[in-house]
Amino acid sequence: MNNIKLYKECYFKNVAVVTGTYCSGKSMVAPIVSSLSKVEHLRKLLVVDQIFHLANLRMINKESAIFLVRHYLDKSFYEQLIGRNINFRIEDETSIFTAKNTKELANRILIKRGEHVITKHIQNKTIFC
């Protein structure tokens, strides 16, 4: 059997990860981080936590976990940039109504998707939270 190596280059290099155990203050710190200049609106990506749990339990290997996380983050960040999966629930922590740039986030559903979206945010050094 051939040893297949999984590798995924990330489109986005600037990522701020707010992590910690339950009740450690993540919900208080993450909105502060996402309010900073060039930082995108807060997203909670529970799949990433689940992938790391599987890796820690040795149910998947480290190489697979890294590949899956990179792939999922790129997909999630791109979808955020084109306005896909926007949270419009007013009272939710990740709602666009709690963002510093609500109108800009809402208008993303109107932009044309494609590689130019990624290029723009790489050049602007956007930080994803």
Regions found by a protein language model. Give the residues of each.
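A conserved segment at the C-terminal end of the G1
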Residues: S24-H41
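Pre-Walker A adenine-sensing motif
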Residues: M1-E9
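A general structural signal for short secondary-structure junctions and capping/turn motifs
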Residues: K8, P31, I118-H121
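Hydrophobic anchor at the beta1->P-loop junction of P-loop NTPases
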Residues: V18
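An N-terminal structural lobe/cap that precedes and organizes the functional/catalytic core
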Residues: E9-C10, S35
